[in-house]
């Protein structure tokens, strides 16, 4: 499936979903070209950004890290700065969500296709890892309570999970396997906290667009009429480690 950016792809996917299709989607990729000498070319875009002055540094840092070239920077009225970048299209994949977070919803980002240019080299999209279910079963409050210390959860108690499914976002860069089906062992000794209710942070429920932005190159988004699930391409943990 090909389209003009993540928004166009999400519309196509949502239409297929409503028609009853069940399928898996990998991370969006750009279409490369090659010149007459066999040199790899990639699509480039011009990005025009209006952002409050205090957030301009974060935006510049993020886009230069995504192979963007700052071509213009000028002050605007009301304490805003206008930035102009030339950036590979793949550098914008998954960025809009980060942009909204970094600017606290106060930034404006518009892009237009420029041309095909020389390939800019490898790029790392995500700086956080995934929390991966270790075994199949039903998510238990106790297991989720221990897991939420690692990062942001995507599921709530009672949801069915299987080995290899992504149940949350790790606060650190690496992936971690966790057991969200873990139950508390019963003992004859009553602990002082036995009667305390375990409180869970409200899980993050991602939209289709957010899920498409989130998935990494080794992950898939499972799309069904009822659910959106993120999983590893290789479900078995042993095989996944060998492949890595």
Walk through the language-model features, giving the residues of each.
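Accessory interaction regions appended to the cores of large information-processing enzymes
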Residues: 1-244
């Amino acid at each position: 499936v090909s389209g003009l950016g993540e928004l166009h792809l999400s519309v196509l996917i949502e239409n297929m979903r409503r028609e009853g299709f069940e399928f898996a989607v990998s991370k969006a990729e750009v279409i490369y070209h090659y010149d007459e000498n066999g040199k790899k070319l990639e699509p480039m875009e011009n990005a025009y950004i209006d952002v409050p002055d205090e957030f301009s540094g974060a935006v510049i840092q993020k886009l230069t890290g995504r192979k963007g070239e700052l071509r213009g920077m000028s002050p605007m009225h009301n304490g805003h700065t206008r930035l102009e970048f030339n950036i590979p299209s793949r550098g914008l994949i998954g960025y809009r969500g980060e942009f909204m977070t970094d600017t606290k919803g106060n930034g404006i980002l518009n892009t237009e296709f420029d041309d095909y240019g020389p390939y800019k080299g490898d790029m790392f999209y995500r700086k956080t890892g995934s929390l991966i279910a270790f075994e199949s079963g039903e998510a238990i409050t106790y297991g989720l309570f221990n897991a939420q210390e690692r990062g942001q959860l995507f599921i709530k108690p009672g949801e069915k999970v299987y080995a290899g499914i992504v149940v949350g976002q790790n606060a650190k860069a690496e992936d971690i396997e966790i057991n969200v089906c873990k139950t508390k062992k019963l003992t004859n000794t009553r602990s002082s906290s036995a009667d305390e209710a375990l409180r869970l942070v409200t899980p993050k429920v991602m939209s289709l667009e957010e899920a498409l932005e989130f998935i990494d190159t080794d992950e898939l988004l499972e799309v069904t009429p009822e659910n959106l699930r993120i999983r590893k391409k290789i479900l078995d943990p042993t095989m996944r480690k060998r492949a890595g």
